[in-house]
Amino acid sequence: MLEEKIAVATGASRGIGRAIAKELALKGAFVIVNYNGSKQAADETVNEITQAGGKAVGVQCNVADAAECEAFINNIISEYGRIDILVNNAGIVRDNLLMRISEKDFDAVIDTNLKGTFHTMRLVARPMLRQRSGRIINISSVVGIFGNAGQANYAASKAGVIG
């Protein structure tokens, strides 16, 4: 179904991102397993994919950093020729009550969850238009609609992804 497709999954070293990466590979895509913090966790995801007969490689990029994202996306396109599927899944939490949350923690969540999604979408949009195909899938959360105590920053970031 996805044979010959190049898929990028951000935040794919564990959790939902790992499950997404494995499913993309199961359907035949070559998966770029993006991670920021844990190379070991990304390697585990890649190993699970390859042991099941799929193809994947782990690539580090902090999606909150626009320059890192630009290098990340440009390197993938340079090496593989295109990106067919982008799944924006990278996300962090810095939970605290609104009156106690620091601006640094608020910004960290917005920068990763919302701006990281923007960075990667902006960078793949033009190449996808040129190739006249491509899919962008943004993972959000019900918290972006209903909120959650202690997660004002997370709720704002996920509401932004929903649009």
Regions found by a protein language model. Give the residues of each.
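Conserved glycine-rich Rossmann-like NAD(P)H-binding loop of the short-chain dehydrogenase/reductase
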Residues: 27-44
